[in-house]
Design a protein with these regions (language model features):
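Secondary-structure boundary/capping micro-motif
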Residues: 1-164, 168-178, 182-183, 189-192, ...
């Protein structure tokens, strides 16, 4: 974007950047999906929106790569400011099942909470993320519940936080090992283990602690369908 003069910043203002080698694009997957109209949903649109709404929560969305023979895939969804990650396992994933994931999340936490907590989603051009209307609009109200933006093709570093989480998830889901034997309950347990791990950048607090502090305990328990001990 600097090279193409989309931004006022020039390369001479970025002394570290000129030392970097040009990034090679990974073309293992074809995420171009040229038949999809992403007008107003591009990465440049995302930058423009965030310039106008700098304090907006931005969640990053991705699928963790699995072996080709698997019928199941793991969806990872992260809120970087508190390192809060929601993961789910989806059999034979497609765009409708991704929409179902967000519909179910909205049903759990309520439309008002969804709009406040998840105003912006940034993802790649995976074919499963192409139902823009289904993701962005509430099945309950028919109104817009979030904004969805796509990274440029083959530029995974535009959503670095979810890429980093995917690396951490490899501790639970090693490359080359099938996940088809895992259930939703297995994934929930691993998700909670990840969220209960202290993180240095959170002053050695856990993502669960950070999320509860910023967004409240009730919202956390609604997301994971867990009974709050204080409410028993």
């Amino acid at each position: 974007y600097v090279n193409k003069d989309y931004l006022s910043t020039k390369m001479i203002d970025l002394p570290y950047a000129v030392k970097l080698k040009k990034r090679k694009h990974n073309k293992k997957y074809d995420y171009s999906n040229n038949n999809i109209d992403r007008s107003n949903h591009t990465y440049l649109d995302y930058l423009s929106y965030m310039h106008k709404n700098p304090n907006c929560n931005v969640w990053q969305l991705d699928f963790l790569g699995t072996i080709k023979s698997d019928s199941k895939s793991i969806l990872s969804f992260i809120l970087p400011n508190v390192h809060f990650t929601i993961i789910d396992i989806i059999k034979n994933p497609n765009s409708q099942k991704v929409v179902n994931f967000f519909d179910q999340l909205e049903e759990k936490i309520g439309t008002e909470n969804f709009i406040e907590l998840i105003p912006v989603i940034l993802t790649d051009r995976d074919p499963c993320f192409t139902d823009i209307e289904g993701i962005c609009f509430s099945k309950i109200t028919g109104e817009e519940r979030c904004k969805l933006f796509f990274c440029d093709p083959y530029v995974s570093n535009q959503k670095p936080h979810v890429e980093n989480i995917n690396k951490q998830l490899r501790k639970f889901f090693p490359k080359g090992k099938s996940i088809d034997n895992l259930s939703k309950k297995d994934i929930l347990n691993k998700n909670l283990t990840l969220l209960n791990t202290p993180i240095k950048s959170l002053d050695s607090n856990t993502p669960i602690d950070a999320f509860k502090t910023v967004y409240g305990e009730d919202l956390f328990y609604k997301i994971f369908d867990v009974v709050n001990d204080k409410q028993k």
